[in-house]
From Swiss-Prot:
GO terms for cellular component: cytosol. Pathway: Purine metabolism; GMP biosynthesis; GMP from XMP (L-Gln route): step 1/1. It catalyses: XMP + L-glutamine + ATP + H2O = GMP + L-glutamate + AMP + diphosphate + 2 H(+). GO terms for molecular function: ATP binding; GMP synthase activity. Residues 209-401 form the GMPS ATP-PPase domain. It comes from Blochmanniella floridana. Residues 8-208 form the Glutamine amidotransferase type-1 domain. The gene is guaA. This is GMP synthase [glutamine-hydrolyzing]. Pfam families: GATase, GMP_synt_C, NAD_synthase. InterPro entries: Class_I_gatase-like, GATASE, GMP_synth_C, GMP_synth_GATase, GMP_synthase, GMPS_ATP_PPase_dom, NAD/GMP_synthase, Rossmann-like_a/b/a_fold. The active site is at residues 85, 182, 184. Keywords: ATP-binding, Glutamine amidotransferase, GMP biosynthesis, Ligase, Nucleotide-binding, Purine biosynthesis.
């Protein structure tokens, strides 16, 4: 199997809640990192050709005979390995040491690790303070109930906890390292320094995960795999598809590339204006506009189940693109703005080492439609896509535009979707967005939108009681849309928005604010 020559740290995931955070911490260093499941195949491991490997934490215990383990091949490819928490226990166990479960002596939360020797490549001269005994100490974050009972041959204990449990081990000859704490969380003050020491100093990774290099590599890859073939892009107007369109524009000839934008009647507030402005700026792009509002809204009549709504919308999109591919002739590739969080949530975080997947049955396409899927930005998180957008010249207000979900307002209108509900929601959303901008709050929030509830609440207009619709406002802050916190918007701001909505949108009598985090709630309501 052909090897990938790109500089890479491979994170082998054992189910830790912090794996995606660990990935981000490595990328923040300017180093490309990728996550794969613990049962990674030998062929895929070799093809990725990593500079170094990190074993993540995880909920298992290596003392359980059914626990996750790792192929012995990983230890034979000659690259540095860093085991974190459960990953350290995997390292110890599979190198011949012994792990013991001590449920009453587990270590959780904030802890101090005493450094026994500074003469090592991983944490030499890294510490937070010197204790009364003159020993260097690291302040760290732990979450484990198993401990190292016997050390494997060739390893040295470098750090211990207050409970005299082994916390840092090193095999300098093999360049294998284990730490019982989590360097990826902010509670471990020197965590980022430790990860940098491993990735840069030990693994010798070059700092190349920057927009200029990312764009260069993506364009090079598109040129190589597409060649002279024709490509159609499913163009939604969101930041992901905007960036994908520009990358294709710079990678292949104008005649090879067509964008298809479908107005399904479910577009979020200002989507049409944003797309129109983009088209005016990049007039050399071939963008086909299709008005299919009635087709989508008609198909959604009477449908209340959110999954059924998604399926209907997806099915119609497939039918539309199938027809377009047939009309445009000689289309070999369907391009999409899939990003890394989409890949993770689909359970395919390491399904391929490349940005290309060949399919004869993509997204519900009939097997007779021979089309391949092109996903140029599937290795990027949302914030990385935005940085690429800025690098490619997109205006800041476009780059920071809140994302609109694929099904659009269909999943922001609970229950049946009607045209009148869409119009109400757009007017409400416009007020919400306008006030966020006026109050200089827009760029302090990562996502904000309104939700239409199919329930009526009593209100008073003039001297009359009337039952009208209820609207939910939602605003969240997040780094990667994998987890999210609700935003504490000022009460005066919420009061102003609420007053405007109930006064300017006569169909609404009540406005409520969503204070749910993800998890357990999702960002969208459906």
């Amino acid at each position: 199997m052909k090897q990938c020559t790109r500089q890479c740290i491979l994170i082998i995931d054992f189910g830790s809640q912090y794996t995606q955070l660990l990935l981000r911490r490595i990328r923040e260093l300017g180093i490309y990192a990728k996550v794969c499941d613990w049962n990674i195949s030998q062929d895929l491991l070799v093809s990725l050709n990593p500079n170094g490997i990190i074993f993540s934490g995880g909920p298992d215990s290596v003392t359980n005979k059914h626990s996750s383990s790792i192929s012995k091949v990983v230890f034979k490819i000659g690259v540095p390995i860093l085991g974190i928490c459960y990953g350290m226990q995997i390292l110890v166990s599979q190198c011949g040491g012994n792990i013991r479960s001590v449920s009453n002596k587990g270590e959780f939360g904030y802890a101090q690790v005493e450094i026994l020797s500074q003469k090592n490549t991983l944490i030499g001269n890294l510490y937070d303070y010197i204790n009364d005994q003159g020993h260097c100490v690291l302040e760290v974050w732990m979450s484990h109930k198993d401990i190292v009972e016997t050390m494997p041959q060739g390893f040295t204990v470098i750090g211990i906890t207050e409970n005299q449990q082994i916390a840092i081990i090193i095999n300098e000859k093999c360049r294998w390292y284990g730490i019982q704490f989590h360097p990826e969380v902010t509670h471990t003050k020197k965590g980022k320094d430790i990860l940098k020491r491993f990735a840069v100093d030990i693994c010798r990774c070059e700092v190349t995960w920057k927009p200029v290099y990312i764009v260069k590599n993506i364009i090079k890859t598109i040129k190589k795999v597409v060649g002279q073939d024709r490509v159609v892009l499913a163009f939604s107007g969101g930041i992901d598809s905007l960036v994908t369109a520009l990358l294709l524009k710079y990678a292949i000839n104008h005649e090879q590339f067509v964008c298809v934008f479908v107005n399904n009647g479910l577009l979020c507030c200002n989507e049409i204006n944003r797309i129109s402005n983009f088209c005016k700026k990049y007039q050399d792009l071939n963008i086909i506009h299709l008005s299919e509002e009635k087709r989508f809204l008609s198909a959604l009549t009477g449908v209340i189940d959110p999954e059924e709504k998604r399926k209907i919308i997806g099915k119609i999109f497939v039918e539309i693109f199938q027809a377009q591919i047939s009309q445009l002739k000689n289309i070999k590739w369907l391009a999409q703005g899939t990003i890394y969080s989409d890949v993770i949530e689909s359970g395919m975080s390491c399904a391929s080492a490349n940005i290309i997947k060949s399919h004869h049955n993509v997204g519900g396409f009939p097997s007779s439609v021979n089309i391949q899927l092109l996903e140029p930005i599937k290795d990027l998180f949302k914030d990385e896509v935005r940085n690429i957008g800025l690098y490619l010249g997109l205006p800041l207000n476009v780059v920071n535009q809140y994302p609109c979900p694929g099904p659009g307002m269909a999943i922001r209108i609970l229950g049946e979707v009607r045209e009148e509900y869409c119009n109400i929601l757009r007017r409400v959303d416009y007020i919400f967005m306008e006030e966020l901008n006026k109050s200089d709050l827009y760029n302090t929030v990562d996502q904000a939108f309104a939700v239409f509830l199919p329930v009526q609440s009593v209100g008073v207009q003039g001297d009359q009681r009337k039952y009208k619709w209820v609207i939910v406002l939602r605003a969240i802050e997040t780094e990667d849309f994998m987890t999210a916190q609700w935003v504490r918007l000022p009460y005066t701001f919420l009061n102003k928005v609420s007053n405007r909505i109930v006064n300017e949108v006569e169909e609404v009598s009540r406005v409520v604010y969503d204070i749910s985090c993800k998890p357990p709630a999702t960002i969208e309501w459906e």
